[in-house]
Amino acid sequence: MEIWLLILASLSGSLLLHLLLRRRNSSSPPLPPDPNFLPFLGTLQWLREGLGGLESYLRSVHHRLGPIVTLRITSRPAIFVADRSLTHEALVLNGAVYADRPPPAVISKIVDEHNISSGSYGATWRLLRRNITSEILHPSRVRSYSHARHWVLEILFERFRNHGGEEPIVLIHHLHYAMFALLVLMCFGDKLDEKQIKEVEFIQRLQLLSLTKFNIFNIWPKFTKLILRKRWQEFLQIRRQQRDVLLPLIRARRKIVEERKRSEQEDKKDYVQSYVDTLLDLELPEENRKLNEEDIMNLCSEFLTAGTDTTATALQWIMANLVKYPEIQERLHEEIKSVVGEEAKEVEEEDVEKMPYLKAVVLEGLRRHPPGHFLLPHSVTEDTVLGGYKVPKNGTINFMVAEIGRDPVEWEEPMAFKPERFMGEEEAVDLTGSRGIKMMPFGAGRRICPGIGLAMLHLEYYVANMVREFQWKEVQGHEVDLTEKLEFTVVMKHPLKALAVPRRCH
């Protein structure tokens, strides 16, 4: 305890001196208001409450001080924005200035180096993002994975039918496995068996849920590694396990690609390009070298995590509301029947484009329950002004997704689940935010999630098919509880338990 008090006192003293020196320059705009007179109080708040508790604290701070505030969580001031107009001004109208990320911390340098979500804004980042958007997430490429989506749908339905309509289903377990199986196929190009999929899923999940525990090494790493040696060794052990699981899959795919090149196979009928395929020959422009195995592993890990957790979490929230409000579920079912009829085997991907209420249900789920309540932190490339306040060069700025999507000025009864709010609008809500931000579950501007189209397809396709095939009912004694809990994404504190009653005889 004495060590931590010494750390905080030293940090506070340096920050206080820094503040006093800055205030001598009265010509520049001030930083956004800080609720804490003493800088170290922001650090204490973060250490005590974590990111989950920080959100409710920020909500009260914004209510008192306005839509843009400063907290000193580390030695750098962190700015938080909870206003859609200011967010649009920053991310869209002034996007190039706000497109960078804060310098990578110790943990990030190991698990996130050369990735898309956390990489610095520059030539390498542009190359990696262009690669995934053109080679994997382009609409023509997305269509080529339709067989994989159908395969995963069959896995889900088989699991649901095994419960017989009378045994409660903990939905998130099945959704997470199914989405992970789909992303593994897209990443490595093969349908792995259940044992292999679960092995990859386990190590990815272990790394993901442990990151918050390891974030302590980002604060004075030489010191924290010394006093928390066992925890540091635990982190390194997880990385070794990840290499043991992922590298054989990457090497196997490399071998397949090289054999195809040697044999000059022209028949592409049964060949579907995987994410790994696109990475093997990429050359980093800033280092004049190809991606090494560690780089490829990190990019594959990012791909699996980004495409699995957010989608599975969003699916659970949407299905929870359909169970809680059966009248919404039945209206959706009627729309599905009117489009595909009674005899169709499943709802095809082309069918969902004809279902406006389905889209409204998905959009309302993303508005009311965005999987991420904050965008990943942005960093500015030069001194700039936002809302009359200074955002200093290299300063960290955070945008509050959930608060913007629940703004009572924009949304009537923002905490209610009302899909009809997206029906009959003269101008549909622009999820990209380019015309204005009303909600931004995928971010906005130059750092918008590149998988937005794929995610929307997955959400609409799987919700439509689950509702068409099963009637989802509340389990007696287990009322749907929409209380939130922060993990990697914001999940249901009490996971959804429901009955899946088949609607049709097979």
Swiss-Prot record:
It is found in: Membrane. CDD domains: CYP77_89. The chain crosses the membrane at residues 1-21. The keyword Transport does not apply. It comes from Arabidopsis thaliana (Mouse-ear cress). Its main location: membrane. It is an enzyme of class 1 (oxidoreductase). It comes from the Eukaryota. GO terms for cellular component: membrane. Belongs to the cytochrome P450 family. SUPFAM superfamilies: Cytochrome P450. Its EC number is 1.14.-.-. This is Cytochrome P450 89A2. It is a single-pass membrane protein. Heme binds at C449.
